[in-house]
Structure formats: structure tokens, C-alpha cells
């Protein structure tokens, strides 16, 4: 008998055995499945007998003391005064929007005595990133702005209780609502090319089917699968070359190498306004800058309630005790006007910390000086505070993920103030509105699509500052690529003076090249923030 014939017979026998085995397995599986189905039906029958249609327990607190609700039934009800709140105190590090909101909710809903609330601020003015002041020697300071929309539920809930400083008897929400009803926001020119020509993006995303699928894939990816992933790990030119990406990255200051998880969270947060993204019709803005329209009313409300603002107080560390699986804040270490001090905490003390900020470590320049030195994470400030806290336990997070690579996370802005009619005529030509009416002007940023810096600029309702002269127009300019040579000014933005940044902006709004230098030097005043 040949080896070949032995092999064939063996294979046939093996196949037969497999077939028999499969048959036995199928019978067993059938019996098993039948038993399982019977058991499942018995369980379902018992559950059905015990089931009652009810909402009892629906709003019970979970293990974190939180429960979820919807509708507006609970939104307008005043909470009962918490037991023991009169014995409690709160220490809030920083005086930005988040910190002031925490203090306001403690006063209004927590019914904590204002004198028991302490706001510790390193600067000599409240507001944090929500700044907006007039420096007589350098010009207007405004490092950014707030883009708001209908579904800022917590913000609107708060500001319905904050009295307006402009309209007696009204709240900040009232005046804001009336303003945006009478003067709704939208852009008439979202992007330009060729020195001030309308790019005619015309409200379209110009996304291919493949690009749409790349965005959807990111949208449905689990958060934990996005850790340490970049946007460019998910998107290619199908997205990056689209107008959708132009709108998105300039509106939210995203770079291709930024966090894919952050990108996903932003999409989820604003997906309901995707139709209003191209022309900013989804957005609403305040009358003045964010400091005068939002921060000051909150500060006045808190001061009237007796809340203590302690300026020139830099918090350097919060020392924790680890006991029975809990992390308990025991000591606040701070520097008050150059003197080291500590605040000892008890079980009745609450501590709130803002751990990080996109405007922390800002360096400034002016019209004739570039920002001095490289932007870096300083040895003080909220990044360093977070680092000191994180050293005590890995569960306090990883601040270096957010501030460890300055070259990949910096961006630069400038405020340019002018009253020159020639410049203002070019502004009118692009935004199709008169910037001196007090109404919406650009309606959001205008992005220079072919700019090497990816320069964008915006003009909000004027005057943007209460002290601003009627003939002045204040422009906010910002760029994402600070280390690339400009198109008119052949040097990186981060090396430019305010005059040079102004010149680059004038070039992109269509000012004749032979007039740019003189107008930038003598007809504008600028202040830089990086």
C-alpha cells in the first residue's frame, strides 16, 4: 500500500470522525441551548411578575452623591439649605470664570456665608483668561474671547441670578438675551484669499465621503482608545484639506498633532450646532469684552455677599493626607506678596483648584517690541501647582501632557487698534458691515486661508471696551503657526513686533503693499500676547 493511499484513507476517516463529532456536538449544543432558553424564560417570568411601571428611585443619588434629571422642574427650584453649611468654609484657587462660578453657586445654591468663601488670586485683578483692560501705555489687553451658544446651561443658570451693571432691575442673562435677539450674530465672510478677496466657502464643508467616515470613526471610538493619539492618527488629507477643517481648527485653535480625544469631545459637545459652524450663526457674543461683561458683574455680586478676594496670593501647593482610601486636603501653601504662608484646613473646609489654563505663562510684547524670551512653563502658576499636587499621587493626573511641549502647544494673538479710514474701508469691504455702529461686525473670525501663519482676525461689537473712543476700532488677530515666516513680513510671528504683526494683517486684508509700512507704524497701536 502506498503512502499516498494510506494518507487518503486516513484523511477520509478523520473527516468522518469530525462529522460524527460535529453531530454529537450539535445535539449537545441543541440540548444545552434548550435548557438555557428554558432557564432564561423562567428568570424573565419572575422579573416580569415583580416588575412595576414606576419612576421610584430614578432620581436617587449614585455613589458619588450625584443624580441626573431633565426638564426644567428642578432648574428653577431653590435647594434646601445644606445641613452644617454654616460651619463650612471654601478656599478657591484662582479667580477665572470657573472659580467665580463656583463661588456664586456656593452663595446662591449652597447658601454658604460669603465671609466663609476665600478666593486666592495670584494677580491683582480677577478674571483669569477672561481679561479685557486698557493699558494706557500699550493699548488694549484681550488674550481671547468667549464663543457662547444656547446650550451653555450652567452659565445661563448662573447669570440669571447675577445683576446687570448696565440695566437696573435686569440680570446679566436678560441684557445678553435682549442684545442677541435684537442683533443676531452671523458672518458674511468666513474666509479670504489673495489679500482680502472672499474665499467663497459659501457655508459648505467640502468633505468627501471618506472624510465624513473618518470623522464618524473618531466620534464613535471609545475614550480609552484615544489616549496619547493625535488627530492626524485618524484624519488624512480628506479632512485636512476640507473647509470643515479650516472652520474647525481656526475656531477652536486645533493643530493636526493635537489630542484626538479632545477633538472627539469637542465634536460631541457642539454637534448640535454643526449647521451653524460655517457662518457662526450658532454663536452669541457679549456687548463688551469678557471681563467687563461677565467677570465684573460676578465680582460685584460676590463682594456684595461678603466673599473675600485675596489678590497677590500665589498658591504653590496643596498638601494631602491619604487615609482610609480618601485624599484629604490638609494644607494650602501660598506666597502672599512675597511672603510664604500656609492655610491649615479642617474637615469642614472645601478646596477648589483650577489646574491649568491656556493663558498661563503668557509673555507680552508691544507695538515696537516682540515678546521677550521664549514662552515656557514658569516655576510658578497653575501648571506648577498642578505638578506639585500630582507628585503626591498618580491619580491627580499628568500635567506634563498639557504643558510639557511648548513648541506644540503655543499660539499667539494681538490686539490692533486703529481709527484710520483707509484701513476701516478695507474692513467694511470684507465684512460688509460698518464697524462703528455698535452692532455685529465680522460675526466671528475671518480666516486668511492662504496665510502662512494661518492668520485669523475678528472685530466684535464696538466699542469693545467701555473706555474706547467712538472713532476707534479694536481688532483681535491670532495665528496658529507662530514659527513660520509670514507672507509680507518674512519672519516668524513669535519674533515680530506689534507693528510687524499689524503689517502682516494689513497685507491680508488688501492694503496696497506700498502703503502697509506707513499705516502699520503710524496709524495703529498693537499689543501682543503669546
List each language-model region with its residue ranges.
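Extreme N-terminal leader/targeting segments of oxidoreductases
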Residues: 6-9, 14-90, 108-114, 528
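C-terminal segments that line or cap access tunnels to active or ligand-binding sites in enzymes
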Residues: 273-286, 348-350, 355-528
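N-terminal Rossmann-fold NAD(P) dinucleotide-binding loop
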Residues: 99
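Rossmann-like flavin
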Residues: 164-272, 284
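Glycine-rich FAD pyrophosphate-binding loop
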Residues: 107-133
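Glycine-rich Rossmann-fold phosphate-binding loop(s) that bind the pyrophosphate
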Residues: 94-96
Amino acid at each position: 500500500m502506498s503512502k499516498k493511499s494510506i494518507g487518503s484513507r486516513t484523511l477520509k476517516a478523520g473527516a468522518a470522525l469530525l462529522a460524527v463529532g460535529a453531530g454529537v456536538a450539535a445535539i449537545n449544543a441543541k440540548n444545552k441551548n434548550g435548557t438555557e432558553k428554558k432557564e432564561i424564560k423562567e428568570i424573565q417570568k419572575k422579573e416580569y411578575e415583580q416588575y412595576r411601571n414606576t419612576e421610584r428611585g430614578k432620581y436617587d443619588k449614585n455613589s458619588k452623591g450625584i443624580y441626573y434629571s431633565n426638564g426644567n422642574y428642578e432648574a428653577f427650584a431653590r435647594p434646601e439649605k445644606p445641613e452644617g453649611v454654616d460651619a463650612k468654609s471654601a478656599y478657591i484657587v484662582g479667580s477665572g470664570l470657573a472659580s467665580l462660578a463656583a463661588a456664586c453657586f456656593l452663595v446662591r445654591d449652597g447658601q454658604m456665608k460669603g465671609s466663609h468663601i476665600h478666593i486666592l488670586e495670584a494677580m491683582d485683578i480677577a478674571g483669569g483668561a477672561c481679561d479685557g483692560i486698557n493699558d494706557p501705555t500699550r493699548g488694549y489687553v484681550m488674550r481671547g474671547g468667549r464663543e457662547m451658544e444656547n446650550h451653555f446651561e450652567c452659565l445661563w443658570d448662573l447669570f440669571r441670578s447675577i445683576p446687570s451693571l448696565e440695566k437696573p432691575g435686569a440680570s446679566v442673562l436678560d441684557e445678553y438675551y435682549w442684545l442677541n435677539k435684537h442683533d443676531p450674530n452671523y458672518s458674511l465672510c468666513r474666509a479670504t484669499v489673495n489679500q482680502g478677496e472672499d474665499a467663497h466657502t459659501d457655508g459648505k464643508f467640502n468633505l468627501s465621503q471618506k472624510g465624513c467616515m473618518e470623522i464618524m470613526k473618531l466620534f464613535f471610538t471609545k475614550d480609552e482608545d484615544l489616549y496619547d493619539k493625535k488627530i492626524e492618527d485618524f484624519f488624512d488629507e480628506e479632512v485636512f484639506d476640507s473647509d470643515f477643517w479650516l472652520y474647525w481648527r481656526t475656531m477652536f485653535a486645533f493643530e493636526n498633532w493635537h489630542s484626538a480625544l479632545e477633538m472627539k469631545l469637542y465634536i460631541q459637545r457642539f454637534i448640535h450646532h454643526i449647521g451653524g459652524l460655517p457662518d457662526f450663526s450658532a454663536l452669541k457674543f457679549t456687548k463688551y469684552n469678557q471681563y467687563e461683561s461677565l467677570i465684573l458683574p460676578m465680582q460685584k455680586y460676590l463682594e456684595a455677599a461678603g466673599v473675600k478676594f485675596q489678590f497677590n496670593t500665589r498658591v504653590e501647593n496643596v498638601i494631602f493626607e491619604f487615609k482610609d482610601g480618601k485624599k484629604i486636603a490638609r494644607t494650602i501653601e501660598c506666597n502672599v506678596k512675597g511672603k510664604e504662608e500656609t492655610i491649615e484646613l479642617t474637615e469642614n473646609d472645601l478646596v477648589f483648584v483650577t489646574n491649568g489654563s491656556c493663558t498661563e505663562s503668557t509673555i507680552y510684547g508691544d507695538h515696537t517690541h516682540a515678546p521677550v524670551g521664549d514662552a515656557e512653563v514658569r516655576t510658578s502658576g497653575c501648571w506648577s501647582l498642578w505638578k506639585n499636587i500630582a507628585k503626591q499621587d498618580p491619580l491627580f493626573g499628568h500635567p506634563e501632557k498639557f504643558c510639557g511641549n511648548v513648541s506644540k502647544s503655543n499660539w499667539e494673538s494681538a490686539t490692533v487698534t486703529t481709527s484710520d479710514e483707509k484701513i476701516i474701508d478695507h474692513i467694511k469691504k470684507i465684512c460688509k458691515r460698518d464697524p462703528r455702529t455698535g452692532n455685529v461686525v465680522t460675526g466671528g473670525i475671518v480666516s486668511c486661508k492662504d496665510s502662512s501663519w494661518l492668520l485669523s482676525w475678528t472685530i466684535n461689537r464696538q466699542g469693545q471696551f467701555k473706555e474706547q473712543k467712538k472713532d476707534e476700532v479694536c481688532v483681535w488677530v491670532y495665528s496658529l503657526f507662530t514659527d513660520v515666516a509670514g507672507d509680507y513680513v518674512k519672519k516668524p510671528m513669535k519674533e515680530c513686533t506689534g507693528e510687524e504683526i499689524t503689517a502682516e494683517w494689513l497685507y491680508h486684508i488688501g492694503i496696497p503693499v506700498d502703503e502697509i509700512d506707513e499705516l502699520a507704524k503710524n496709524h495703529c497701536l498693537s499689543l501682543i500676547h503669546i
